[in-house]
From Swiss-Prot:
Keywords: Cell inner membrane, Cell membrane, Cobalamin biosynthesis, Cobalt, Cobalt transport, Ion transport, Membrane, Transmembrane, Transmembrane helix, Transport. It comes from the Bacteria. Pathway: Cofactor biosynthesis; adenosylcobalamin biosynthesis. Belongs to the CbiN family. The lineage of its organism: Bacteria, Pseudomonadati, Pseudomonadota, Gammaproteobacteria, Enterobacterales. It is found in: Cell inner membrane. This is Cobalt transport protein CbiN. Its main location: membrane. One of its GO terms (biological process) is cobalamin biosynthetic process. InterPro entries: CbiN (IPR003705). It is a multi-pass membrane protein. Pfam families: CbiN. The chain crosses the membrane at residues 5-25, 63-83.
Amino acid sequence: MKKTLMLLAMVVALVILPFFINHGGEYGGSDGEAESQIQAIAPQYKPWFQPLYEPASGEIESLLFTLQGSLGAAVIFYILGYCKGKQRRDDRA
């Protein structure tokens, strides 16, 4: 019980603490940072690929990114669960 409460308190702290550490800060993301680094290293560089779909806003882009990550996690954990169930079935037989 004590271990569970300690772990729960740590999870809550990890969720709430970032709101107070850099309050009002801006998160630019890695794409913008990579673009600025490329421009600093090789200003003549021209991208060789254009996106197939450009989201209307940053919120929609974040939504699509989150959905992609969620779908990937669902597939991975489905496969892990399937393999675990198959292993248990084989152990019982």
